Each structure stands twice: as structure tokens, then as C-alpha cells.
């Protein structure tokens, strides 16, 4: 049996046990104001600390969890743990990814609201990140669920913006609060003028529609300066920080200007 098959079998056998026995953990990637002065939010990202195989990245188990029907319990664990840990971080948003399978589950909205209530988390601080895949199967049902979620004060972000076929239609129809420009555009921005033009256009469109604009995958000072000049509101990427444990977010929030040294050295 090759390594990929061994990994898949191990994930199938062990992931349910990991969810039930606290072998998962969350790291949080900071989302920073465009001038780099303020931590405005964090994105919760799951990690798996396997007792025999060490740290397993999400790229090795999320897709398998979707295939094997484990993505709903996994996603519910992530949301509950994130709300529990982030409850102490006042004044910043908590972003949590929602998979298409999770979103289409009949109890999705009820589970989100129950989790918020049971963890005593402020719904105004929660932001659910949706991709185009969440919306394409049943747009009417998706719209109803989104309206219900927003009625409870929870924010919605369109993730991976610019990579799908119908993103502009979704911006017109669905009530998003934020768009996240996909990292793939930033990867080629410095080598191709077309990517820079597209990023500029997406930022302008978001602002014109009254949406917050966040650029993902920011890794260089040149990207930062460009994104600031075109009017992005928020930035996320390795220039500022990789995903870190909750204790590091605690530390960053105690600082007046947590990313000043990073930007000065860039």
C-alpha cells in the first residue's frame, strides 16, 4: 500500500477518535489593518496533533473528512472551540470557514446559533467565510440561510474571491459583509501586470459595494504597499504572521503596535 493510501486509511480510522478525544487544536492567523498598525481579526485554522504521526496539516485530512462524512462534526468542533477560545479577545473578529457540506446540512443555522449561545460568544464578532461552492447547488436555500444568520448578527465573507465563475453575481444577490481576494492573484502580481490590474479592480468593486476588502497571502512589503495604495481594508499573510496558537494572539493584543518591527524591517 503506497503512502497516500496509508494516510487516507489512517485518517478515516482515526479522525473521529481525534474529534472526540481532543487531539485537534486551533491556530489563528492574524488579519491586520491595511496600515499594519492594528490586529482586527483572526482566522481559525484546525490542526491535528496525532499521537503516533505528529502534526498533520489540514491539507492531509480535510478532503478525506468531506469524503467520509466527518466534515460536519469536525466543523462543529472547530466553531465551538474557536468561539470558546476567542471569547476573551474583545474588539476583534473571529473568522471561521464553512464547507459546502456543512452549510447545506439541515441543522446548520441552528447549530451556529446554539454554539454562539452556549459559548456566550458575541455574534457581532463572528464572521463565517463561505466559498462559491456553498452557493451554487441551491441558491434560494443558501440565500435564506444567509439571511437567517445575518439576522442573528453574524457577519459573512466571500472567500477565494475572483477564482469562481459567478462571484460577481453572488455579490449582487447575497448579503456579504466582506470579500477576501484570493492569494493566487498576489502570487503573480509582481511578475504579471494583469494580476495587479485584477486585484486593483476587485478592491475597487468591493469598496464601491460598501464591502470590506481583505487580501490574503500577503508576503512582501511591495505587496503591502500596493494593497494599501489601492484601498484594501485588511491584510492577511506571512508578512505579518503565520497561523499561531491562541497564546500568541493574547500576546499580540497586549501590544500597542504589534507589527511595527516587522514592517520596519520589510
Where are these regions (language model features)?
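Cyclic nucleotide signaling catalytic output domains
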Residues: 1-10, 14, 60, 64, ...
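Bacterial c-di-GMP phosphodiesterase EAL domain
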Residues: 3-121, 133-134, 147-148, 168, ...
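Short, solvent-exposed loop/turn segments at secondary-structure boundaries
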Residues: 6, 107, 140, 190-194
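Short, contiguous acidic/charged loop-to-helix segments that flank catalytic cores in large enzymes
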Residues: 65, 69, 136, 188-194
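Residue-level marker of structural boundaries
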Residues: 70, 176, 194-195, 254, ...
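Short, conserved glycine- and acidic-residue-centered signature motifs
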Residues: 75, 142, 195, 199
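The catalytic core of metal-dependent phosphodiesterases that act on cyclic dinucleotides
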Residues: 115-189, 203-243
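Intrinsically disordered or compositionally simple regulatory linkers and C-terminal tails
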Residues: 247-266
Amino acid at each position: 500500500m503506497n503512502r497516500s493510501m496509508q494516510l487516507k486509511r489512517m485518517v478515516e480510522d482515526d479522525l473521529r477518535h481525534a474529534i472526540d478525544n481532543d487531539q485537534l487544536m486551533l491556530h489563528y492567523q492574524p488579519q491586520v489593518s491595511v496600515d499594519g498598525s492594528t490586529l482586527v481579526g483572526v482566522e481559525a485554522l484546525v490542526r491535528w496533533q496525532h499521537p503516533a504521526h505528529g502534526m498533520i496539516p489540514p491539507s492531509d485530512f480535510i478532503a478525506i473528512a468531506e469524503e467520509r462524512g466527518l466534515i460536519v462534526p469536525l466543523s462543529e468542533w472547530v466553531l465551538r472551540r474557536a468561539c470558546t477560545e476567542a471569547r476573551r479577545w474583545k474588539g476583534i473578529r473571529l473568522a471561521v470557514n464553512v464547507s459546502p457540506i456543512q452549510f447545506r446540512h439541515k441543522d446548520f443555522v441552528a447549530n451556529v446559533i446554539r454554539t454562539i449561545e452556549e459559548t456566550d460568544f458575541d455574534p457581532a464578532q463572528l464572521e463565517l467565510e463561505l466559498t462559491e461552492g456553498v452557493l451554487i447547488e441551491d441558491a434560494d436555500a443558501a440565500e435564506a440561510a444567509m439571511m437567517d444568520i445575518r439576522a442573528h448578527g453574524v457577519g459573512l465573507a466571500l472567500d477565494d474571491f475572483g477564482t469562481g465563475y459567478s462571484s460577481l453575481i453572488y455579490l449582487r444577490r447575497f448579503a456579504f459583509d466582506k470579500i477576501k481576494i484570493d492569494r493566487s492573484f498576489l502570487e503573480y502580481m509582481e511578475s504579471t501586470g494583469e494580476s495587479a490590474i485584477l486585484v486593483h479592480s476587485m478592491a475597487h468593486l468591493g469598496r464601491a459595494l460598501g464591502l470590506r476588502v481583505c487580501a490574503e497571502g500577503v508576503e512582501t512589503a511591495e505587496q503591502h504597499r500596493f494593497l494599501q495604495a489601492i484601498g484594501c481594508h485588511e491584510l492577511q499573510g506571512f508578512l505579518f504572521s503565520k497561523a499561531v496558537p491562541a497564546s500568541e494572539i493574547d500576546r499580540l493584543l497586549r501590544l500597542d503596535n504589534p507589527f511595527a518591527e516587522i514592517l520596519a524591517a520589510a
